[in-house]
Regions:
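Short, low-complexity disordered leader/linker segments with a strong preference
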Residues: 1-44, 421-427
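Immediate post-signal peptide segment of exported/extracytoplasmic ligand-binding proteins
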Residues: 32-45, 63-69, 141-143, 186, ...
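Early extracytoplasmic/lumenal segment of secretory-pathway proteins
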Residues: 42-44, 49-106
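Short helix-initiation/N-cap motifs at beta->coil->alpha
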Residues: 75-86, 103-106, 178-184, 252-266
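Hinge/lid segment of periplasmic solute-binding proteins
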Residues: 103-155, 293-294, 362
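Glycine-centered hinge/linker elements that transmit conformational signals in sensory
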Residues: 186-190, 224-254
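Extracytoplasmic/periplasmic substrate-recognition and gating elements
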Residues: 247, 284-345
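C-terminal capping/gating helix-and-loop segments adjacent to ligand/active sites or protein-protein/ligand interfaces
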Residues: 366-422
């Protein structure tokens, strides 16, 4: 096999619901109205995803080779969109897809939804995933509730053409030398914005905060699930993020917003934290824009942002078929193909020595050796933040607090106090 070149497709507009059908679709998902399974008709399994999972080609492959079960993808722009739909229909007791993708940070709350999701434990799948990934999807009773798809080891995406305009190095290795620590990263950014006025250093304050939180062992909760948001590490992240808003390093745009998406086409910023799954998002949003590259570096060492899981809601009509599809989609062979399509790095160690990973390049990112870079970024991760059952809700409050500083509705001190009040209200 020769070198693998990762393809790209334009990302769906944020908040837009797209139902992508591959093959003959005859029914909806687990809302009770679906057909299939009788009179020789195929069962249709709906798979709800968000952002870019790289499943389009896989679904076509499955549907071309299966007459009894067909797959339909229900795709939304962001996890926030998916989350709202998920909890609304969980409360209603019907309407969810047969398979629901869950963002990794939300898994602790999902594990607490007693009886709402099927037990996917299968001894034949022992060892399929990295240990720490499998643990994220396993509840206190030892039941596995989700099958992991990808993981989010992070590097830095950057605009080499804008670096050149600022008189900065553009070579990947030289760029890596500019941002080994957060202090280095911010100092380089201050230099950049002086030389390229009108262009921010990074894409969003919220994205930066997420990147920094991924290096904090206990950002919001202690290991016994006690909420502690007044710890020194979290306050240091807050001060760094809001302080650099005031210095002008941030776009002040909310990640996933329409304005944020549009900024990719307007020289809006020069760098952003990029887990593997973000590469497809960048390439889609920045379609037609030359100059993007991907550096083998992450300030402060390493970090993992995201990664997702496939779950099977118990309210579905075809849970056994859904389990079969979820198993197939998360097998190493399929996740390698998803990586080739969208850059989503597999959570299955058996994939790591595959030539499709080790030789992978990405044409959009100046033929960067993304497989090699992401594999090395994985080795740099030394901290897995503790995420208790309230992590996702507290993170949402933290991001809202940052947004208030971005839009000028509150100064950093007042917004921090509002954050503390909001967290207390969570109970």
């Amino acid at each position: 096999m020769g070198r693998t070149t990762i393809g790209t497709r334009r990302r769906l507009a944020v908040g837009t619901l797209a139902v992508l059908m591959a093959g003959t679709i005859t029914a909806c998902g687990g809302d009770g109205d679906g057909e299939g399974g009788g009179d020789g008709k195929p069962v249709t399994i709906s798979v709800a995803t968000f952002n870019e999972f790289g499943y389009e080609g896989l679904i076509e492959e499955w549907n071309d080779s299966h007459d009894d079960i067909k797959i339909e993808q229900v795709k939304v722009g962001t996890w926030d969109d998916a989350k709202a739909n998920l909890y609304t229909k969980l409360a209603a007791g019907s309407g969810l897809s047969d398979i629901e993708a869950i963002e990794g940070d939300a898994m602790p709350a999902i594990l607490a939804e007693e009886g709402a999701f099927e037990d996917l434990t299968d001894p034949e799948l022992d060892g399929r995933w990295l240990d720490w990934v499998a643990e994220k999807a396993t509840n206190a009773d030892g039941r596995m509730i989700g099958y992991a798809t990808d993981i989010g080891h992070e590097g830095i995406c950057y605009r080499a053409d804008l670096f050149e305009k600022a008189g900065l190095p553009t070579d990947r290795e030289e760029v890596a030398g500019l941002m080994g620590t957060w202090d280095d990263y911010f100092a380089t950014g201050e230099d950049f914005i002086k030389k390229v006025p009108g262009t921010a250093w990074y894409d969003s304050s919220g994205g930066l905060a997420q990147a920094m939180l991924n290096q904090v062992e206990n950002p919001f909760e202690t290991d016994d699930n006690t909420v502690d948001v007044e710890n020194d590490d979290l306050k240091a992240v807050w001060d760094a993020v809001t302080g650099n808003v005031e210095k002008g390093l941030s776009t002040k745009l909310s990640q996933w917003s329409d304005d944020w998406t549009a900024s990719f086409q307007k020289d809006g910023f020069a760098t952003m934290a990029c887990p593997g799954w973000m590469l497809g998002v960048v390439a889609g949003n920045a379609e037609g824009v030359d100059g993007w590259d991907f550096a083998n570096v992450f300030p402060g060492g390493g970090g993992n942002w995201g990664g997702s899981f496939l779950t099977v809601p118990s309210q579905g009509d075809h849970v056994e078929e859904a389990k079969e599809v979820a198993n197939w989609l998360t097998a190493p062979e399929q996740q390698i193909k998803a990586f080739e399509a969208k850059g989503t790095f597999p959570s299955q160690p058996a994939a790591y020595d595959d030539e499709a990973i080790t030789t992978a390049t990405n044409e959009f990112f100046n033929d960067a050796p993304v497989g090699q870079i992401l594999a090395e970024r994985a080795e740099a991760v030394t901290v897995q933040p503790y995420k208790g059952p309230k992590y996702s809700d507290i993170l949402q409050a933290f991001q809202a607090a940052i947004n208030r500083v971005d839009d000028g509705s509150q100064d950093p001190d007042k917004s921090w106090q509002q954050f503390l009040t909001d967290v207390e209200a969570l109970g």
